[in-house]
Amino acid sequence: MIGNLRGIVDEVCSDHIILNVNDVGYIVYLSAKTLSACSIGSRVKLLIDTYANSRENVTQLYGFISKEEQQCLRLLVKVSGVSYKTAMSILSKLTPEQLFLAIINEDKLALKVSGLGLKLINRIITELNGKVSKLEINNNHFHSISEDALSALINLGYERTKAYDTIKKIEDESPNLDTKDIIRMALKTI
């Protein structure tokens, strides 16, 4: 089994890259977020998960820049009915932190991706709700002030993931704001 690969990106496609490691080109499937960080000629180190697809008689490599994203994939594929491709679609839409929040808050809308029905979304939430605490996500900086601001923006009709991203960006830039100021800045930004 391959733990990680370090090499130069030879080609970037819609859902994978070809990673040149010592003149051997590996096809590595990536989430859209990880894929956007790769450019031809760039040097990258990817954590790797290997999946042997017996139906198609192929072995596929899935790459991750962060350990958290890799752990999310491993949890998602343990849910009955979630394939590696489906898990990567979810991780293309949500960061590990957003996935964590969506499962804890039972946010079915945030988990909605193409090809994922309501039954499977419910199964993901049900099966992973108790397991998300095992995710080693740096969630410490997202404290109660942010949760209050997030709740306020959601109640005003904004989408959870967009509100979360906006609040996180505001807190990263200005960490000592109170809830009222975070909401005010978020409303100007969204």
From Swiss-Prot:
Family matches, as Pfam families: HHH_5 (PF14520), RuvA_C (PF07499), RuvA_N (PF01330)
Subcellular location: Cytoplasm
Protein's name according to its UniProt entry: Holliday junction branch migration complex subunit RuvA
One of the record's GO molecular function terms: four-way junction helicase activity
GO BP, one annotated term: DNA repair
Record GO cellular component, one term: Holliday junction resolvase complex
Family annotation (InterPro entries): DNA_helicase_Holl-junc_RuvA_I, NA-bd_OB-fold, RuvA, RuvA_2-like, RuvA_C, RuvA_C_sf
Region Domain III, residue ranges: 147-190
The species this protein was found in: Wolbachia pipientis subsp. Culex pipiens (strain wPip)
